């Protein structure tokens, strides 16, 4: 059960990193709320 929240946090970090890369590709600071 302790590893569950850790995995969720890691997924969120990877998600924002991917969104960051998308932002740079689009050339704008508009981030999707998803």
Curated annotation (Swiss-Prot):
Where is there biased composition of kind Basic and acidic residues?
12-26
Disulfide-linked positions: none
Q: Does the keyword Glycoprotein apply?
A: no
Q: Where is this region: Disordered?
A: 1-34
Q: Name one GO biological process term.
A: sporulation resulting in formation of a cellular spore
Question: What up-regulates or down-regulates this gene?
Answer: Expression is sigma G-dependent.
In which compartments does the protein localize? Spore core
Q: Which UniProt keywords apply?
A: Sporulation
The record's annotation in InterPro entries points to:
SspM (IPR048194)
Q: Quick one: where is this thing mainly located?
A: other
Q: Where is the composition biased (Basic residues)?
A: 1-10
What protein am I looking at? Small, acid-soluble spore protein M
* Source organism phylogeny: Bacteria, Bacillati, Bacillota, Bacilli, Bacillales
Question: Gene name on record?
Answer: sspM
